[in-house]
Amino acid sequence: MAAAAGAPPPGPPQPPPPPPPEESSDSEPEAEPGSPQKLIRKVSTSGQIRQKTIIKEGMLTKQNNSFQRSKRRYFKLRGRTLYYAKTAKSIIFDEVDLTDASVAESSTKNVNNSFTVITPCRKLILCADNRKEMEDWIAALKTVQNREHFEPTQYSMDHFSGMHNWYACSHARPTYCNVCREALSGVTSHGLSCEVCKFKAHKRCAVRATNNCKWTTLASIGKDIIEDADGIAMPHQWLEGNLPVSAKCTVCDKTCGSVLRLQDWRCLWCKAMVHTSCKESLLTKCPLGLCKVSVIPPTALNSIDSDGFWKASCPPSCTSPLLVFVNSKSGDNQGVKFLRRFKQLLNPAQVFDLMNGGPHLGLRLFQKFDTFRILVCGGDGSVGWVLSEIDSLNLHKQCQLGVLPLGTGNDLARVLGWGSACDDDTQLPQILEKLERASTKMLDRWSVMAYEAKLPRQASSSTVTEDFSEDSEVQQILFYEDSVAAHLSKILTSDQHSVVISSAKVLCETVKDFVARVGKAYEKTTESSEESEVMAKKCSVLKEKLDSLLKTLDDESQASSSLPNPPPTIAEEAEDGDGSGSICGSTGDRLVASACPARPQIFRPREQLMLRANSLKKAIRQIIEHTEKAVDEQNAQTQEQEGFVLGLSESEEKMDHRVCPPLSHSESFGVPKGRSQRKVSKSPCEKLISKGSLSLGSSASLPPQPGSRDGLPALNTKILYPNVRAGMSGSLPGGSVISRLLINADPFNSEPETLEYYTEKCVMNNYFGIGLDAKISLDFNNKRDEHPEKCRSRTKNMMWYGVLGTKELLHRTYKNLEQKVLLECDGRPIPLPSLQGIAVLNIPSYAGGTNFWGGTKEDDTFAAPSFDDKILEVVAVFGSMQMAVSRVIRLQHHRIAQCRTVKISILGDEGVPVQVDGEAWVQPPGYIRIVHKNRAQTLTRDRAFESTLKSWEDKQKCELPRPPSCSLHPEMLSEEEATQMDQFGQAAGVLIHSIREIAQSHRDMEQELAHAVNASSKSMDRVYGKPRTTEGLNCSFVLEMVNNFRALRSETELLLSGKMALQLDPPQKEQLGSALAEMDRQLRRLADTPWLCQSAEPGDEESVMLDLAKRSRSGKFRLVTKFKKEKNNKNKEAHSSLGAPVHLWGTEEVAAWLEHLSLCEYKDIFTRHDIRGSELLHLERRDLKDLGVTKVGHMKRILCGIKELSRSAPAVEA
């Protein structure tokens, strides 16, 4: 009661507290000044929303104030309002009015695919699952803002609309809004920037920005288009303000732009920057800048085809435009930066994001061009995607493809010369320039075909060997088959009648003995009368086949007896001394073509003979198989006999299938020569082969049909394991053709005869892997799919590969892969050692830059690897350690073969990991064939051409200016000029006379100066040789003569500065020196003639160009002080004032030179020691000490002056 009394009296019921608002309602308000700070929440019911037409809907992640508070919400865009709630079935939806809204990406790299919806009173930050979904939402919101109809297919055409593509960013210097002209807020000038044209805006001003983004089509240019006699052209597209600090006006070459206000202009295409007052002085037509070769001008996009795709016309100025595909996910989202930079450099309509629609739209746009280039910015997977789309549109003959490495491995980019990685988007102009100078190479592309079929798995070799060794009875049975095969081979290949008859007799006895022994063995193992009857029928069939063969032989014998001469041989076969030839062929070996088309007339029934031989072989094989089956059934009841039967029946099939794939119809009766006779220890597999012939009867050994493409000789295959192959062929009885064909019989008979039944899984451009490397790649792909945030950078990806490789080093998942797969190269079975994987290489770069083949040059066994020779390299993967070591050391012991086709059979019931160019999957049991598909044109960086071109450009800078044309000066000389040229002609004649006189006694001078003297004499004869007309001398002939004599003077002085100065006598040296001095004096007088002054001596501009060229070749930026410049000028002035060449100086000229260096105190010393010009050029530090120059500063000044004289004087006079 007390408690009740103390309680307050009950009043009216209090309303329940309002529910807390959803997280989605407390979005961050716009913080910029002038924006309302109060957020009014509006809600709608699902019924109200249902009445409106939906534009787009889906789940997005909504951020509030931090990532920790981000929530998944369901968004619906209907009309000009955005609705969101927790789920699609929610009743209450929050709404955002989009009347004055703008949308922008949230960051520069935008790793989380976020975008911001900016309204006058709030800012809504949303994150999509991927970039494509984000761009879909941005495009839908833009169309709503623009009051346009949105269709889901329009997202890929967004850059044709002319609207700005905003993203939020900060700036390192004051930046101004292009809408309100005020500075962007904050110390970092945070605001919005258009990713294409760099239009700047406040977030509140973005909605008021005009749609004047960079032009893409002819319609977007509008009324500013220029029409002239050459057609239509594009004017400059100007954007005001926010110029870089180093901006200079293109017209007046003065600094422009400002950090205090929005002023001056920049062209979005040619990047020209001008003052507002100079803008009218610039040419109206835009030259499109340094990248004009790669740019598609907007005037070329002027129509749309029936499918809604833009069509590009082919203007004359656009011969090989560039189509750019960027994978925005590649390289830790570095692709987003490259995507924006390419849109700024080129036409945005020629830049496409592979994550937003793929390559189809871009290729459709460019397919009308006769030739165009493609640049794929991404990894090897992106390149394969683009090439596959090129296949579907059949554009291989029109386009050349280059690669900019943004992925993880980038193997193809390494091989093509574009490097292993590219992270700096500021280098794109230089990259585009290198792409224009690239050369073209063909890239082989290979189809990876698959046919799924369950194939029995082979057992361990050791177990098989033991089982075979325990049973001598089975070995004797198999011996009969070997004997039959050997004698059949002699009958088919021998042209000697006696050999054929003797082989036929032995064959008859062997078959009879074989039937008798089979009968005895069959009585021991079978008691059923039914099975006895079956065996009796098979033996009777065998007897019929033998009779048919003998009858055919008799017919042939009768035909051959009528001719006097023996027939020619059917085929040439390698004869081994011990009868154990090698199946493996050397480099130049080829399989002998089928003997059927070249059969002589006396062997008319030879086709029947082959058929009879094969039938006989089949019959024997059927009897043996039936015997084995009966033994299997009888002995399956006991444990000991079960092991014997398994060792007989299974191992024979497995070892057959391991080393001998089916022949199909691709091989004929012929074998290549053996390559090696080396004897090595036999593996368990080879021991088994040595005990049994592994021959199986099959129709596959029939001769090919005439005219069949598969009947052609096999291509050369180079195999590294000659010892293994020699062991195989040595185990076959007699080394005969039939025995070698029997080894190729298909024990399962399950492979389709043609590729029509195969399915193309993918196309290989780089490499194919099965086993260990594919397992690592598959694990990495699965981890990247589960945790994409852990695999966003190239460094992290390489670390993950290392971790997964170390894991496989311990687990050894595929340590017995040779028991799970069989390998054929060009139709030849390859016995495999113990390995964990097989790699098939098309390019010499594997798994991120490893040269897994182990070399780039040709050797005695293999040709040099190349990606344009239609040859694959096959290598073995022994383990993770080998893959790691091969990155440092070029290993070669794991090479298997070089071939043109590869076939891999997967045995058992379980699939095996397979990877192509880094994309991995688990391939079910069956067959995999790798065959050549086509070739693609690729752009390869040509460093040699770039170096040569750069040298040529430097040389062009150093060359003298071209002589002015006759139109720049009078056609005839005046009287004063004619008098001056007469004096010049006299000096020229003296110089030529002196050179010819000295050349009579010095053959070296004649050889060195003959060309220059002849050219000067001809030009002199042209001027003075004919009678002078009343009009005077022709100025063009005079100009040519002056130039020739300048060249002659330079070459003569250069010759005298070398060893020739020591060979001449003093009178000859003095005679030639005086002639050269007079020529120099006449050339300096020509400087008074305006149209000859440029030819007479280099001007200041040329000197500057020479200096720049020297500086650029040095590779360093050197600061030259004012004192050093003045000193160099003094040296040049001293040299020019003294007139004569340095090596002709006397003591007076040397003293004058010292006076120019302000070292008058040493004049007497140099004169007393008779230091002349030739000695001066060879003075060294110790010589100066001996002369009495003790001060270090004076010594350095003299040595630098001497160096300058010997280096710059000839260059200036040349």
UniProtKB/Swiss-Prot annotation:
InterPro entries, per database record: ATP-NAD_kinase_N, C1-like_sf, C1_DGKdelta_rpt1, C1_DGKdelta_rpt2, DGK, DGK-delta_SAM, DGKD_4H, Diacylglycerol_kin_accessory
Zinc finger (Phorbol-ester/DAG-type): 163-213, 235-286
Gene Ontology biological process terms from the UniProt entry: diacylglycerol catabolic process; diacylglycerol metabolic process; endocytosis; intracellular signal transduction; lipid phosphorylation; negative regulation of phospholipase C/protein kinase C signal transduction; phosphatidic acid biosynthetic process; phospholipase C-activating G protein-coupled receptor signaling pathway
Residue stretches making up the SAM domain: 1145-1208
Gene Ontology MF, one: kinase binding
Enzyme class: transferase
Key words of the record: ATP-binding, Cell membrane, Coated pit, Cytoplasm, Endocytosis, Kinase, Lipid metabolism, Membrane, Metal-binding, Nucleotide-binding, Phosphoprotein, Protein transport, Repeat, Transferase, Transport, Zinc, Zinc-finger
Main location: membrane
Domain PH: 53-146
Gene Ontology annotations for the cellular component aspect, listed alphabetically: clathrin-coated pit; cytoplasm; cytoplasmic vesicle; cytosol; nucleus; plasma membrane
Residue ranges, annotated region (Regulates association with membranes): 1-52
Domain notes per entry: The SAM domain mediates homooligomerization. The PH domain mediates association with membranes.
The protein's name: Diacylglycerol kinase delta
Lineage per the UniProt record: Eukaryota, Metazoa, Chordata, Craniata, Vertebrata
